[in-house]
């Protein structure tokens, strides 16, 4: 027998005597069951277009009973008998009972004859059996089913509601709030639950029954007055009515789930269709953009001007910078959308997406490849055209510049070559004209290259198809014709000048000699003036001595320079003598130089004035450098004494801290006297600071007389003061440790001797191995076995808690003092608390306040945990855990 059968047999399919007793004991239950079961049957029979009025009469022929079973089971029963005789009715009822039995239901004491005879008790029992099998048995909530499942379902659904506590199917429903809570949980818009009152059960019940009938299609199976007027409502009636709620709401839940599933499928489908549409549109737009862009990139019509080509290049850059990047993003997004769409279709068991013809990703990639190929060709064409136009513009500008320079140079040259100025010129003028003409011929020859370059540029412009070639050719031809004419005129003038050259050669030679000697001498004077007026910046006596030596050497050259000046002036005087002798027209000036005798004399006088000024400046600077050198020596002498003194004191302090003798008080007194002697040295430091200030004011940046800088001295002095203070502090701490721990002076000396013995590098600290050897020498049994290593690790954790890898003397003293002195421990404190507590394992607040000072008592009360031992009393405190926490063996 399955779970339903056993449950049904044990709980509801009671023997006939029990049914009689139930009916006799409480007729109200029979009334409730009649109404409830009738309404339940009609809720199903109406689907077949019929109903019952009297439950014990309308099922007597078995026809409506068979119809009811067909409706609620969804199965066809055996064909009923249509006769009116008793045997036909019994046959139909038996068919119905057989069908019920075929569903695994045991029918106890229910026979067809009783049903046909209209036995109310048997008829109600049979209907209840049908309700159990077809309305309640299939209810399953978590691990429970049937009645327990229905009860659990009710409890879960009504759990959030106040004043509702469903524990059974009788009195838990009397106030009507349970029915209202079930409706509100699933259809909150149907009932205003907040307005219901527990003390108004009739209103609550009628509200629930009316709403269920009107909106949930659940007929009224119960009377509110019967439920309220009955001490214990009929359980079967309540279960039947509640099961209708379960099936109504479970059906709605299934419909909602089905609708959600359909919506989800449709949403996926709609999303996929939208992605397909987006892909098609994006692909179409991208291909259209490529189709429009390629002809623009294939347009290779060259421009005549650089401005026009640069505009094309700027348009192309705008295309690359502004127009193409969004399309690149669109192409990337298109591929992403395509892959995403295919993945979604595959995951949702949909066929793969096939884009329209010509819009495949491969088609877009091919079109994009064509675009980039054309784009690359267009860019190369643009750059080549720009380079060509740049070359043309450069050549055209070069042609214009060279032509303009040449034309400016030739301007007036023909008129100059045609003039007859040499006919009335003096000897010097003829010589000058001849030299000038020679210079012109040289200049003319030099310009030959420019003319050839102009012609070559014009030829290249023609070959490169320059748009303004006609004007270039016309200008070039004009320049060439003019050049030929200049050559002919130049030759004619040379011949005329050479005829008169010898007449004025002597004067010309003198002028030339004057120019050759005047120019170097003039340059020498200008250089001398620059040197004499040049400012100097020196930092040493050697540098100023070098400048003084150079100046003396310069003054030694002045007599020879004066002789050269007189010789140059003599040449000028000789020319004047010749002019006066031969009455030569000397209206012109020396053609070889612009330097006049007056200029030479003026510069010579200026040089003579600058020499004594330079002497004075060098003398003053020499005195300043001597003063600076004295400052250097003065600072160096003091620094060379103070620096080693500081170093010596540092070494002595280090030695004193290691090799201390006598009592700690003697050592402290000695160190303080030593500190006083160091402090008394401060005036010498201050004096050195004053000398350093003078050096800085004199802008002296180096000092060869010492390797010590003021910064070195300051740092050393501060380190010295810090070291002596730290050493004094260490001795003071040792005194505190000795006094606190009761260590004798002999023990302290022994500890110091052992520490210094193993501090072989005199660093003031011991490494792990040195410390271990020191402990062994003091009698500690620390072997190399695991136990010894563990003990040494424990000791190291005490003396080196920060894991620095070294042990200071103070840490060594602290450890040795703990090992040798009689110190208080957690056990001693616990023993003291036990005395105060009267030998109990706990202590009370009153005992603490009675035995300890108020502040210390409150301190203990605030931090002691409650005592939880078997002998605990109210207010007992745990002094043991408190004692261990004081020594870090547990947490406070």
UniProtKB/Swiss-Prot annotation:
List modified residues, type Phosphotyrosine.
12
**Major place of localization?**
cytoplasm
Spectrin repeat segments run 274-384, 394-499, 509-620, 630-733
N6-acetyllysine found at: 95, 195, 676
What are the record keywords, sorted?
Answer: Acetylation, Actin-binding, Calcium, Cell junction, Cell membrane, Cell projection, Cytoplasm, Cytoskeleton, Membrane, Metal-binding, Phosphoprotein, Repeat
Subunit composition? Homodimer; antiparallel. Interacts with MYOZ2, TTID and LPP. Interacts with DDN. Interacts with PSD. Interacts with MICALL2. Interacts with DNM2 and CTTN. Interacts with PDLIM1. Interacts with PDLIM2. Interacts with PDLIM4 (via PDZ domain). Interacts with IGSF8.
Instruction: State the name under which the record lists this protein.
Output: Alpha-actinin-1
Q: Which organism is it from?
A: Macaca fascicularis (Crab-eating macaque)
Gene from which the chain derives = ACTN1
